[in-house]
Amino acid sequence: RCSTAYAVERTATETFSTNPSKIRKRLLLTDEMRLIMMFEDSFPSGGFIDCIDFLKPLERTSAAIDLLSLRKLRTMLDTLRKVTAFFSSVKDGVYPNLKRMSAGILSFPEIHRRIDNIIDRYGEVKDTASDELYNIRKSLREKEGAISPRMSAILKKA
């Protein structure tokens, strides 16, 4: 069963084949993945997110990404990193077809680093995401700090 709309779409485009080499290749890939799912605990089992819907609009120069989509992108990049690390760590000859297939995957470390500069590990926007945001949040904390003693004094008098 497919976990993303893209995967459903991709499998729907698969066609019947009578080509022996194509059939052999598909069977080898399927068997390697079956073995991974059965025996490899270090292979990621989640985090496969279809990002196309929110990445496509970012091709425009004035586009922006919302926080939820940024969280999803980070999750997908983490999963991608884990998948490539898994295949890099397996010995040559083990899962050779999937390993070869994963060799061309790009991990986009700069994008990952930029996301980590914007959101924390809980997916919340960091105060330091921008200088302007830092100043706004600092000002709010100072005002909250000034209001708190006044509220306490008013409540004590009441």
Predicted regions: what they are:
Residues 1-140:
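Conserved amphipathic alpha-helical "coupling/scaffold" segments
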Residues 135-158:
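Extended, Lys/Arg-enriched charged tracts that mediate electrostatic binding to polyanionic substrates
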